[in-house]
Amino acid sequence: MGKILIKDCTIVPISGPVIGKGVIAINDDRLHYVGPAGGLPAGWQADTVIDAGDMVALPGLVNAHTHAAMTLLRSYADDLPLKQWLEEKIWPREDRLEREDIYWGSKIALLEMIRSGTTTFADMYFHMDAVAGAVVEAGLRASLCQGLIGLQDTSNKRLEAGISMVKEWHGAGEGRITTMLGPHAPNTCTPEYLTRVAETAAGLGVGLHIHLAETRGEVEDVKARYGATPVALVNKLGLLDLPVLAAHCVHLTTEEIAILAEKKVGVAHCPESNLKLASGVAPVKEMLAAGVNVAIGTDGASSNNNLDMVAETRTAALLAKGITGDPTVVPAHQALVMATLNGARALGLEKEIGTLEAGKKADLILVDMRQPHLMPPNDVEANLVYAARGSDVDTVIVNGKILMARGEVKTLDAEEIYAQVTKRMHKG
């Protein structure tokens, strides 16, 4: 890793005001200095110098909810309601996927994420050891969990796989991999199964990653079965007493929003997937006002259909304004906070990533602002949210290692990945 100096860049630290003509000094895997050039400790020498005169540096983006390997199913089943999409298309196809398929499906996802500025992601799927192996090779940071569909896990084999995932991979990849347990949703797991998973997670010292209140159908189904809404049910069962990352949270009452805030639940808002599946629009304005930690996720590429967090952040900001009729909701800085620090907090990583501050992990991206759609730079944060594209990301650094420079990914062989993914596209 060594020492890296990024000079002459505009810095969006998230934790403070924008810094013009700043420098960032990286010592191995940590940020050593972030600020004006004059403040760099005298005598500090770098092994690698990056001239970033036309660049903006900001924390790496955090994709708070996705299913990386589902990139294999991009454009496979579109324009369908969620229930039909899952039960008639996705789940039958997934039954035919093997470990190697998951590995290569994950690698194409990681390539896409690196190229569009994501440095950390939260993932729920199966054959998660294959996902973890791909993450180690790519150099990204990830929170991984085995997806646990309780109604299909009568022998507890999936739960056992989830436990093995935690024990074998938590802290792997120089600490870049963390783990959770992943009960799929309240309508695909019985209360008894949810309780068992929560108790297991508590014993392992990890949190939970769960889909929650994604569709109106889910809410009605859970109410009909158990006499409570999804949020009320998981709260009653004690799940929310653990660290919880809850994906979607589209259909919520005022009382449920208060519960999420009180229990410090991290919400992964997935606007583009929710729009495409016509699941609804999450009450982001109300959640933020109540103090809920709202992060941003893409969901899987099979329902988005991309993993571009730059685009997702723009959608999150614009959708919140359009649905409320209030143009002041989710201003540019708030959107960037949601895509970085709030994502880190939702994954329990806010002490290490999410802002550019000395002492934190060196996870950052450089965005090339010398683009016609980013000129003039009247407001750097506004340009990043409302005008930037994922393809504007020039450099990606994770844990002090340069994963992409001048748009070239150094840790993955794109042509090999394309060939493998194309070969597996029609499997089964």
From Swiss-Prot:
| Note on how the cofactor is bound | Binds 1 zinc ion per subunit.
Keywords of the record: Hydrolase, Metal-binding, Zinc
Entry-linked SUPFAM superfamilies? Composite domain of metallo-dependent hydrolases (SSF51338), Metallo-dependent hydrolases (SSF51556)
Q: Which chemical reaction does it catalyze?
A: S-adenosyl-L-homocysteine + H2O + H(+) = S-inosyl-L-homocysteine + NH4(+); S-methyl-5'-thioadenosine + H2O + H(+) = S-methyl-5'-thioinosine + NH4(+)
Q: Where along the chain is substrate bound? A: E94, R158, H184, E214, D299
The yes or no answer to whether the keyword Hydrolase is present is yes
Highest taxon above the source species: Bacteria
User: Which annotated residues bind Zn(2+)?
Assistant: H65, H67, H211, D299
EC number(s): the record gives 3.5.4.28, 3.5.4.31
InterPro entries per UniProt = Amidohydro-rel, Deaminase_MtaD/DadD, Metal-dep_hydrolase_composite, Metal_Hydrolase, MTA/SAH_deaminase
A GO MF label = 5'-methylthioadenosine deaminase activity
Q: Which family does it belong to?
A: Belongs to the metallo-dependent hydrolases superfamily. MTA/SAH deaminase family.
The record describes the protein's role as:
Catalyzes the deamination of 5-methylthioadenosine and S-adenosyl-L-homocysteine into 5-methylthioinosine and S-inosyl-L-homocysteine, respectively. Is also able to deaminate adenosine.
Quote the protein name from its UniProt record: 5-methylthioadenosine/S-adenosylhomocysteine deaminase
Chain's gene name: mtaD
